[in-house]
């Protein structure tokens, strides 16, 4: 089953995407082991757990936290990942303050 995410590759703008709701697909999306950072009750940023250790390039800041490497935003329901509950337009307007998220 696929889930809808908001994806941001290093140096690229945010985009809507879908990935398989599997650990392997999530690891492939961030290029390694995953780590989550909760930014709201039902929303997390998924990033590469070893991004800083591996010296991955800076990506962006989300809700006051800097991220390196490719990341994505997804919704949560309990312990499960679900479709991201916000549109790309609302994400850019309300969550990251407009622009392309490269700040």
Segments predicted by a language model, with ranges:
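Domain-length accessory/inserted modules outside core catalytic folds
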Residues: 1-103
